[in-house]
Amino acid sequence: VPVNVLKRSVLRQLKNKRTEIANSAGLGADCAVFAPFSKGQMVTCVQEGVVELQCENDLAEAEREDLSVMPMRRIFQKCANNLAAAGAEPVAAELVIFLPETVEEPELKALMEEAEKAATDLNIQIIGGQTRVSSAVRQPIATATGYGILSEAAVTQASAGKKLAGQDIIITKWIGLEGTADLAARNREKLLERYPAYLVEEAAAFDRYYSILPEAATAVKSGGCTMHDIS
């Protein structure tokens, strides 16, 4: 994208800061710099998705069936969940967005505002990335690379943890939570023909339970030997 668009609609939307980051990438600076830390380890993960430019219930029929289409906030939540499942505290993310030629600047700005809100809610600093326009894509595609810090205690615990007979398998919240929320949000009108509105809206609102960060932190403190985010 042009430099003025990059400044106005991308970089200016990034406000959340963390002490673990010495410098973010930006104009003329292609690399972010992490502040030195003496204990623990760096953990990283990647989450991708086709990004919605409109609200979920306005999706085209084909998009309703494609679960790779998701709001920007979901990409960040999945990234944070994966880091937390590794026992790490999410601290930073890089965001790459490929845009179709039909996308206007206000839509890009809205995507970045949504990304920044999602990152801020998770206390993640967006430290860099790329924003490109390409005739090869039909819808915005986003990839977030997340970075987390695994504390020294968590490193020791993970290396000592063993899966043994007699251990408990603990599942938090509910199986099918994400799928239920997706189906309800993408098919509101169809579901309202058969079910009461309160039931459909409650199901669609299950997205408020997506975060596993509190449970993951508890598992680390409690000596869990392994974790996995099944979303």
Describe every region a protein language model picked out.
Residues 1-231:
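Helix-biased detector of long, well-ordered alpha-helical tracts
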